[in-house]
Amino acid sequence: MLDWVGGALGFAYVPPSPYGIFMRPAYFGLTGGNYGQNRTLVHEAGHYCGLFHTFQSTSSCGTETNCNAQGDRVCDTPPTTGNFGCPSNGGACDNDLVNNYMDYTYDTCMDSFTQGQTLRMLSSLETSRPGVVTP
């Protein structure tokens, strides 16, 4: 039996933790609502492939001194405090990527990973989850 933490819609283990993505059935598939367009599954797959939230370990806007060790640890995603809903003003920080799958915006707003996130996922799959991708 899975014991859900708080109001989580799903969760995934990041490498090198045990494999797995878990989803609440109500948020799997095209179920309607703010989080019912399968973007939660894409978000959790991002975690499974080594990504963190765009707002990971960040409590303010600004510049990271070491983008490989701070925030989401991907240099082409700017620091953010995290977004909810579909912010029409571009988010809490001036350069927020409110459309990023690794934020908490509504599914209708999410539509992309950055190039750096894509490279991190590919690297993670090759090194930490080699059985998932075959040449």
Model-derived features with residue positions:
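Extracellular (secreted or membrane-anchored) zinc-dependent metallopeptidases
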Residues: 1-42, 48-135
